[in-house]
UniProtKB/Swiss-Prot annotation:
The gene is MGR1. InterPro entries: i-AAA_Mgr1. Component of the mitochondrial inner membrane i-AAA protease complex. It is found in: Mitochondrion inner membrane. This is Mitochondrial genome required protein 1. Keywords: Membrane, Mitochondrion, Mitochondrion inner membrane, Transmembrane, Transmembrane helix. It is a multi-pass membrane protein.
Length: 390
């Protein structure tokens, strides 16, 4: 019994031609997986004259292996640690300072005069001329540059806001999130290109101007509050003495360091809010409970509540010929006059910028403080409702 072999089909020849074309075209070959997918990390070496079926080699870019961490005054080049590794930066600054002192010592050894002893009883002793000034100037200049760079780097580390620090810290988190383990010394240097020195100077300059303006506004508010405090305390004869207490003003750098970063600001606001909650719950809102809610509402309606504000004026809304007897009429009047906009014009807002995400160490919240915050929010809502009823 014979075996039937079908004749060649035209479609098979077309498939072979397409396959050969795909092998000839290097752009249609799949890219390798792994570290070669990183941006600017590999150089693809493909020859257009390579025959089909050959292996394509991917040569890594050697420049991506060298860290390029920025610094303000360090001279260590590729050995410079990441900007978010502060202990390593302080250590390199100290090492550079010691190196600068070593260069100064070498310059002193080259330039100081030397004695020549001709005989044992030769008095006075003879001194050789001083060494070459140019030979001693080279290590002296090198030491001066090294120590000056230490000063610049320390000035950068003293800043409360460092764009290089924030950038390195962000990309280290990105690398950890992607499953990589960045170097503890160099950071995630293969994930980003640090910003230039000019961009860093511009960002720091903008931050310094904004912080200086904010501190000046706070100082003006403090001066006004001191004057008001003095005017509210008259003497025995009834005279009011307007005396401005001099406040010691520190330099701008120390005030910026006291201001701190956003995390410190957030923690400071949280602590101040907690103390205000406790003060309100211990004094004004001490008797505000759910058990005496009906009694408090009755006192508010009768105008005998201690929480009612007699100086509060309701927003002036002119209804004209409209009535609000039914729900439809009330909705029509509400949409027509927009009382929320009226209330918005008569309300002052105090806006504080806080981070929109939480740190890992702030996840553990105290249950007592949460209960205090809930009770305070409930009390505030009742106080606002009482104002509207009045």
């Amino acid at each position: 019994m014979g075996v039937y072999i079908p004749p060649p089909n035209d479609n098979d020849s077309d498939k072979d031609k397409k396959k050969n074309k795909n092998n000839d075209n290097p752009n249609l070959n799949p890219e390798p997986s792994g570290d070669s997918k990183k941006v600017n990390n590999v150089i693809k070496g493909v020859s257009s004259t390579s025959p089909p079926g050959t292996t394509t080699y991917y040569i890594p870019n050697p420049s991506t292996w060298i860290p390029h961490n920025p610094s303000a005054g360090l001279i260590w080049g590729p050995l410079t640690p990441s900007s978010d590794n502060r202990p390593a930066l302080y250590g390199m600054v100290g090492l550079q300072f010691i190196l600068g002192l070593g260069f100064f010592r070498a310059a002193r050894q080259l330039y100081r005069p030397r004695t020549i002893v001709t005989s044992v009883n030769s008095i006075p002793q003879h001194f050789t001329p001083k060494g070459s000034f140019w030979k001693a100037s080279i290590p002296a200049l090198t030491g001066a540059v090294a120590i000056y760079g230490c000063g610049l780097e320390l000035s950068r580390l003293m800043l409360a806001y460092d764009p290089w620090y924030e950038e390195a810290k962000y990309y280290r988190r990105v690398a950890i999130k992607n499953g990589d383990k960045p170097s503890a010394w160099f950071g995630a240097y293969d994930y980003y290109k640090p910003m230039s020195t000019k961009a860093w100077i511009d960002k720091v300059g903008i931050w310094i101007k904004a912080t200086e303006h904010e501190l000046s506004e706070k100082q003006e508010v403090l001066d006004v509050s001191i004057v008001q405090a003095n005017s509210s305390n008259p003497d025995d004869k009834g005279h009011v003495e307007h005396v401005l207490i001099p406040v010691k003003k520190n330099n701008l750098m120390s005030q910026m360091n006291k201001k701190g970063k956003y995390v410190e600001i957030y923690n400071r606001l949280r602590e101040s809010n907690k103390s205000r909650y406790r003060t309100l719950l211990d004094t004004d809102l001490k008797d505000v409970q759910e058990l005496n809610k009906a009694e408090r509402i009755d006192l508010i309606l009768e105008g005998k509540s201690p929480y009612s504000n007699p100086e509060y004026t309701k927003p002036h809304i002119q209804l004209g010929n409209h009535h609000v007897d039914t729900d439809d009429e009330f909705e029509m009047v509400w949409l027509n006059f927009e009382p929320w906009d009226e209330l918005k014009l008569e309300t002052d807002y105090d806006i504080r910028l806080i981070p929109h995400w939480r740190w890992a160490d702030s996840d553990n919240s105290e249950p007592e403080l949460d209960a205090v915050e809930q009770q305070h929010n409930h009390s505030i809502s009742e106080a606002e409702s009482s104002k509207e009823l009045v």
